[in-house]
């Protein structure tokens, strides 16, 4: 782990994003609404394109101003989280397409996979997509240049006290 | 609500329960680790309940929620309870031994030094009190 510049990343915005993704996907499954799963995919895609959490606006405009969720700003790399969301977008798009094409088991399986990974991140503090990002970085792939914050297991939420 | 929706609802509940069970087993694993490493903190048994609190200097929820909750519980229980604070950034060895993956994390140990509860993330004062009372 070499010296690198970390940025301030608000993990509450990421958590809000994950919780909304989990909720909407479970609702989509219960109500059998592939269109809702497609909407989640779309929001994750927009978020990936804009380099923000897809449902981060809920935190920014509603939860944070009203004090319903407090900021949890940590020194971290934003890139792995963006990559994780992009991976989620790919899975959700594949899941939605499968559902529209009639491959329901595959489709809902992919949707539940996203739910499980988002839950692991939201409740366990482990970001699988981030771990994949750091793992790819070990192979010196272009674009995967960041390393985990010092003292942090790749993919785990930083324990802070982290120095750039 | 159609029968299909009901079926899907219960299926979703089942999947969530399964996930919660996996999480429960993970917590049990953490408690076993804590039990095996309790003597990394004590030379002799504490003879009173202990809260082992893993934190770091820059952890915002630790400062805004967890620290005030622990202060309050210490005020309420006084000498009947011991709180041990560990800076995970200064003692990564201890954090690793105890299986701490995020902060704040609190372990509640009974008077025999046996880890009985683990809270991954913020544990509010009501929850901590409830847990301490069963120790």
Stretches with model-predicted labels:
Chain B
Residues 1-36:
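N-terminal targeting signals for export/organelle localization
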Residues 45-57:
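Short active-site neighborhood of thiol/selenol oxidoreductases, capturing the structured segment around
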Residues 59-62, 106:
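The canonical Cys-X-X-Cys-His
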Residues 63-75:
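Typically the conserved alpha-helix immediately C-terminal to a functionally engaged Cys/Sec
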Residues 78-92:
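Thiol-based oxidoreductase modules, predominantly thioredoxin-like and allied folds used
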Residues 99-107:
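Structural micro-motif
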Residues 109-135:
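Non-catalytic, surface beta->alpha helical segment in thiol-disulfide oxidoreductase systems
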């Amino acid at each position: 782990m070499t010296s690198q510049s970390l940025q301030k990343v608000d993990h509450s915005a990421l958590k809000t994003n994950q919780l909304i993704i989990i909720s909407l996907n479970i609702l989509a499954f219960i109500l059998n609404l592939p269109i809702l799963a497609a909407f989640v995919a779309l929001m994750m895609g927009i978020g990936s394109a804009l380099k923000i959490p897809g449902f981060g606006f809920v935190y920014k405009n509603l939860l944070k101003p009203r004090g319903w969720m407090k900021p949890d700003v940590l020194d971290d790399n934003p890139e792995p989280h963006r990559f994780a969301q992009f991976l989620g977008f790919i899975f959700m798009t594949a899941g939605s397409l499968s559902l529209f094409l009639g491959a329901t088991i595959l489709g809902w399986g992919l949707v539940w996979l996203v739910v499980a990974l988002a839950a692991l991140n939201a409740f366990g503090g482990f970001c699988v997509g981030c771990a994949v990002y750091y793992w790819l970085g070990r192979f010196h792939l272009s674009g995967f240049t960041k390393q985990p914050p010092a003292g942090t297991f790749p993919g785990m939420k930083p324990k802070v006290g982290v120095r750039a | 609500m159609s029968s299909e929706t009901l079926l899907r609802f219960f299926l979703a509940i089942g999947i969530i329960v399964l996930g919660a069970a996996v999480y429960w087993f993970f917590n049990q694993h953490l408690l076993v680790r804590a039990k095996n490493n309790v003597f990394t903190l004590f030379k002799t048994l504490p003879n009173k309940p202990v809260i082992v609190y893993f934190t770091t200097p820059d952890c915002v929820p630790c400062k805004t929620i967890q620290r005030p909750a622990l202060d309050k519980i210490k005020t309420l229980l006084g000498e009947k309870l011991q709180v041990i604070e560990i800076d995970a950034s200064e003692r990564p060895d201890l954090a690793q031994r105890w299986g701490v993956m995020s902060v704040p994390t609190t372990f509640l140990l009974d008077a025999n030094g046996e880890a009985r509860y683990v809270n991954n993330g913020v544990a509010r004062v009501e929850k901590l009190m409830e847990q301490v009372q069963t120790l």
